[in-house]
Amino acid sequence: HQGVVALFDEDDGRLLCLMNAGPITARRTAAVSALSVALLARQDSRILAILGAGIQARAHLEAVAPTRGFSEIWLGARHPGPAQSMAERDPRCHLSPSFEAAVTMADVVVCCTDADSPVVAHQWLRPGCHVVSVGSGAELDADTVAGSK
């Protein structure tokens, strides 16, 4: 996705700056996701799964990981190189062999993919799992969406 953020002078409306919207959007989106985890996820949530390894996934690792006392963070990604770079940011991070493996052990699942088909199946989710989906509309299967509260 491409975008820009324009900053204008509040007094006279002059354009002060044009910025790449990617990093700003990633941080804003991750902040809202972190708020949802802080307010809605079970208090005893200890295992976080992040699916994806792009700019949104990196921002979500930074924003969501501090919201709970996560003892483990599992990273699921189609491309292991970027996921490995993410894992090096936090000693709690582990690379998962699959999306399913990451999801089945998680109390909180954050989906940040551009998948064109589901990467989360309802039957993989533990009871009470909090799911955040910020990527494509296809990340979650229909049963996960229908079963959400």
Regions found by a protein language model. Give the residues of each.
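N-terminal Rossmann-fold NAD(P) dinucleotide-binding loop
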Residues: A57-R58
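Short glycine-/small-residue-rich Rossmann-like dinucleotide-binding loops
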Residues: T113-A115, G135-S136
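Phosphate/diphosphate ligand-binding glycine-rich loop within oxidoreductases
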Residues: H1-S45
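Glycine-rich Rossmann-fold phosphate-binding loop(s) that bind the pyrophosphate
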Residues: G52-G54
